[in-house]
Amino acid sequence: MTTIVSVRRNNQVVIAGDGQVSLGNTVMKGNARKVRRLYHNKVLAGFAGGTADAFTLFERFEAKLEMHQGHLMRAAVEMAKDWRSDKVLRKLEALLAVADGEASLIITGNGDVVQPENDLIAIGSGGNFAQSAATALLENTELSALEIAEKSLTIAGDICVFTNQFKTIEELKY
C-alpha cells in the first residue's frame, strides 16, 4: 500500500504521498509518484491501494473532472453515481484523495464520496499514523499545510513498513 495525506490551512491545500510499491512483503519500487495535478493544475489527487485499481479509479475521476469543467464536487458525485451502476467496477481496492481550492474529498473504490469535516485526509496503510500526526500539528502549531503534510508523512514512514521516505508533494494556493 502507501500513505497519502492532504492538509488544508491558510488558503493552501497540499497532497503528499510516499513512493513505495509493495507486492506482498516485497518492496518492488521506492520512487513511485502517487500524487498528481489534474485539470489545468487546479486539482490535486493522490491514490492508494491496488495499483491497477488505483489507476482505474484515477482515470475515471480525471475523465469526470474534464467532463464537468473542473468542478470537483460535481465530478466526484457523478462518478459515484456511475460507479454504483457498474457491477465490474463496484469493488475496486483503492482510494483517492482529491482537493481543489474549495473542497477536499475521499473517493473510494466502492463509489463512496466523503468530505472530511476538518479538511484533513489520510489514506493507505500509514493513513492512521499520518492523520494522528497531522491532527496534532494542526491543533498545536502554526506550521503551514505543506510542512504539516511533509512531517506527518515522515512520521508515518517511520512507523509503517509499507510507507517509505520518498515523497511527492503537490501544493495549491488559492
Swiss-Prot record:
Keyword Cell membrane tagged: no
CDD domains the UniProt entry points to: protease_HslV
GO biological process: one example: proteolysis involved in protein catabolic process
Entry EC number(s): 3.4.25.2
InterPro entries cross-referenced by the UniProt entry: ATP-dep_Prtase_HsIV_su (IPR022281), Ntn_hydrolases_N (IPR029055), Proteasome_sua/b (IPR001353), Proteasome_suB-type (IPR023333)
Primary location class: cytoplasm
GO cellular component, one term: HslUV protease complex
Inhibition and activation profile: Allosterically activated by HslU binding.
Family: Belongs to the peptidase T1B family. HslV subfamily.
Primary role: Protease subunit of a proteasome-like degradation complex believed to be a general protein degrading machinery.
NCBIfam families registered for this protein in UniProt: ATP_dep_HslV, PRK05456.1
Record protein name field: ATP-dependent protease subunit HslV
Organism of this sequence: Shewanella piezotolerans (strain WP3 / JCM 13877)
Underlying gene: hslV
